[in-house]
Amino acid sequence: MSGHHLILGQMVDYLTGESITDTHDERYRQALAKQLVEEKGYQKSDILPRRKLIVAAGDKCAQIQIDLTVVLEDVVAMIIRYGPGSLVTRHRPALAASRVVAAYQIHIVVVTNGLDADVLHGKTGSILSKGLDSIPHRQNLLDRCRTHTNEPISPKRIEAEQRILYAYDVDDSCPCDDTICKV
């Protein structure tokens, strides 16, 4: 056991086939990836697991992880952030991530604890729907991407969103969280 995360051994990542650490949290992430492919019509190749993202806050810098990044037709269309517990407390850092992960505003942001989900409008932050079943199907998300422009994010906004993300994900992280790396 490392910190408070119970290590259950090794498991095979559903999307990549790689061997990864088996934890309760990872089991939720794997179930979500499987749901996206088997129920929502996504291809495994549409979904990037554990995408690393560098964020800065002044002279501080860290690498964080985006649990699932969905890319359709070379556009980052949706990010999914997992975290146990309350969903509402995870809205703001997920929205910040959606404004940093690409040079444009991501259309859909999903916050989930593995049992429930809030699907957020990337630009406004408003809740579009609730529940794991309400995560958009691949074709719906693709249609949305084709009909909405990819609005660029200004450098000033990116800097502010990185600071927010740093505060939530790095400053407030558990010391045993090995997905966060200060650089």
Predicted regions and their residues:
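Short beta-alpha junction loops
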Residues: T112-D116
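A short, conserved, highly charged catalytic patch centered on acidic carboxylates
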Residues: M1-I108, D118-V183
